[in-house]
Amino acid sequence: MKLRRIDHIGVVVADLPAHVAQLEAMGLVLERVGDNSESNALYYPCGDASVELIEVRDPVIAARRMSEEEQARIEHIAFEVDDLGEVRDLLESRGVEVSWPPFPSGSAMMIWTTAATSGGVQYQFLVRPGGEGGGA
């Protein structure tokens, strides 16, 4: 399994405008907006990776992803890889639960680990178009 690079770090936030202001005050510039039925996601590139700010719309889902006391929390680290099947096989051989089959998000295909089986950290693995395969 080869990790090509860190693609992004996902940060769940309670107050999206406040966190946007913080990133923009540091000189980061909004690259793209992701929007789905559950959340808004704003991507701010920094070098080869991005910071993804995630605002969850549904209060019940938001409570599962972040406690009421938190203003923000790093939710996941995303890695770009060449082959999702290879990642799944390796991680499952080591006892890590992985979502399968891969599912699309924008132009990428992705899988996720279950934090309880991956040392308390949730990891996302994705293949972007033009990658060397999807393993699906």
Predicted regions and their residues:
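N-terminal beta-strand motif that seeds the catalytic metal site of vicinal oxygen chelate
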Residues: 1-18, 74-77, 129-136
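A cross-kingdom feature marking solvent-exposed beta-strand/loop segments within repeated
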Residues: 6-7, 26, 31-39, 57-75, ...
